[in-house]
Curated annotation (Swiss-Prot):
It comes from Danio rerio (Zebrafish). Residues 276-309 are annotated as: Disordered. The gene is gpr22a. CDD domains: 7tm_classA_rhodopsin-like (cd00637). This is G-protein coupled receptor 22. Residues 287-305 have a biased composition (Polar residues). Disruption phenotype: Morpholino knockdown of the protein leads to defective left-right (LR) axis formation in the embryo. Cilia number and length are reduced in the Kupffer's vesicle (KV). Morpholino knockdown of the protein in Kupffer's vesicle alone is still able to generate the phenotype, indicating that Gpr22 regulates LR asymmetry through the KV. The chain crosses the membrane at residues 75-95, 115-135, 145-165, 186-206, 236-256, 344-364, 378-398. The lineage of its organism: Eukaryota, Metazoa, Chordata, Craniata, Vertebrata. It is a multi-pass membrane protein.
């Protein structure tokens, strides 16, 4: 198809040259054929055939990202919406059902984080899906600016809430008797966090100029331009100057605070696993020494005669006390291991999810945005939204009080299902959660008494 127009142009150029040479040789041709007309005829013939490139540009505007990129990001974002909403709403429902869970300061701070995760799942993640699937033709500057505002809100609010939970845990571990973070101070801290988050939400709109008349006039004049220029202008990324310091400040405070918490619990990070096998033979020696003590006391008591019961009592009490001490030491070591693992999980999850997008924001501010950095930023944003799934697992489902409440609710649910749907033919199903021993004893004793009564009547 491309060879045919080129051949036609060559033929037309040949005919024009022949015509110009013929008319140029005569006097009439020299007088009546100026060179401007020949140049205009040539240019008109050349420009008639160039009508293909604008169509390709419009096709590129309709598909801003590859289809595989759109499908993968949309799938991950939908999964985060489903898992994040289900887990966070479950946690909030259980917190609201039990009044004793809301009474403490640490639970209120944790609930604030779960409320934020619900808002991110409802507002921020769906808007990211719209931006990924949105064609760039038309004026989409308002949607893009709103998306940047949601990203700014999510990053600042998440970092601030994680920082508040870290300070609360430090206050519990280091100063359990006289706590600094009281209920009134906690409410003031949460209020300041929400105010800071709302201000970070407004910064992209102020930056774009939607609240001023000049900004509105500029948006009306730039309505015909493609909206991909929104993401490639450096002046629209200055709101990242507030997100980057908050992230690094939160990361440093988390590292220092959890190190202090481990020190308060006498947990050494380097020699924690090497100190356990050294103490075990000492425990065995003490146990063996205590086991030899009752033998010697038994020998002395057998020789003593009347003093035997008193010596046996003292030896048994010593053995019981030593067993309790060993059990307490083991529980303490298990508690320390659990705290150490949870601290590592909390720190690593926050850093793994939010470090890539923060580093990329720093690169954008230093070098400038491009199409590649815009796509990479959307991928890192999916990683950052993964905290909506990890927060309930790290801060709620690992707590013992929350686990007890969840188990009790599940028990009541199972009991109601068993009572509402009885089996036919009077078949009794014993539930393992509803004291099976007590029910079995009662039924067994009743049948045994009936058999005895029947046997006694037969004998009589």
């Amino acid at each position: 198809m491309e060879s045919m127009p080129s051949s036609l142009t060559h033929q037309r150029f040949g005919l024009l040259n022949k015509h110009l040479t013929r008319t140029g040789n005569t006097r009439e041709g020299r007088m009546h054929t100026p060179p401007v007309l020949g140049f205009q005829a040539i240019m008109s013939n050349v420009t008639v055939l160039d009508n293909i490139e604008p169509l390709d540009f419009e096709m590129d505007l309709k598909t801003p990202y590859p289809v595989s990129f759109q499908v993968s990001l949309t799938g991950f974002l939908m999964l985060e919406i489903v898992l994040g909403l289900s887990s966070n709403l479950t946690v909030l429902a259980l917190y609201c059902m039990k009044s004793n869970l809301v009474s403490s300061v640490s639970n209120i701070v944790t609930m604030n984080l779960h409320v934020l995760d619900v808002l991110v799942c409802v507002g921020c993640i769906p808007l990211t899906i719209v931006v990924v699937l949105l064609p760039l033709e038309g004026n989409n500057a308002l949607i893009c600016c709103f998306h940047e505002a949601c990203v700014s809100f999510a990053s600042v609010a998440t970092a601030a809430n994680v920082l508040a939970i870290t300070l609360d845990r430090y206050d519990i571990s280091v100063r359990p008797a006289n706590r600094v973070l009281t209920m009134g101070r906690a409410v003031a801290l949460l209020g300041s966090i929400w105010a800071l988050s709302f201000f970070s939400f407004l910064v992209p709109f102020i930056e774009e100029g939607f609240f001023s008349q000049a900004g509105n006039e500029r948006n009306q004049t730039e309505a015909e331009e493609p909206s991909n220029e929104y993401y490639t202008e450096l002046g629209l990324y200055y709101h990242l100057l507030a997100q980057i310091p908050i992230f690094f400040f939160t990361a440093v405070v988390m590292l220092v605070t959890y190190y202090k918490i481990l020190q308060a619990l006498n947990i050494r990070i380097g020699t924690r696993f090497h100190s356990v096998p050294k103490k075990k033979p000492r425990k065995k020696k003490t146990i063996s020494m205590t086991s030899t003590q009752p033998e010697s006391t038994d020998a002395s008591q057998s020789s003593a005669g009347r003093n035997a019961p008193l010596g046996m009592r003292t030896s048994v009490s010593v053995i019981i006390a030593l067993r309790r001490a060993v059990k307490r030491h083991r529980e303490r070591r298990e508690r320390q291991k659990r705290v150490f693992r949870m601290s590592l999980l909390i720190i690593s999850t926050f850093l793994l999810c939010w470090t890539p997008i923060t580093v990329l924001n720093t690169v954008i501010l230093s070098v400038g945005p491009s199409n590649f950095t815009v796509r990479l930023r959307l991928g890192f944003l999916v990683m950052a939204y993964g905290t909506t799934i990890f927060h309930p697992l790290l801060y709620a489902f690992t707590r013992q009080k929350f686990q007890k409440v969840l188990k009790s609710k599940m028990k009541k649910r199972v009991v109601s299902v068993v009572e509402a749907d009885p089996m036919p033919n009077n078949v009794v199903i014993h539930n393992s959660w509803i004291d099976p021993k007590r029910n079995k004893k009662v039924t067994f004793e009743e049948t045994e008494v009936r058999q005895k009564c029947l046997s006694s009547e037969d004998v009589e």
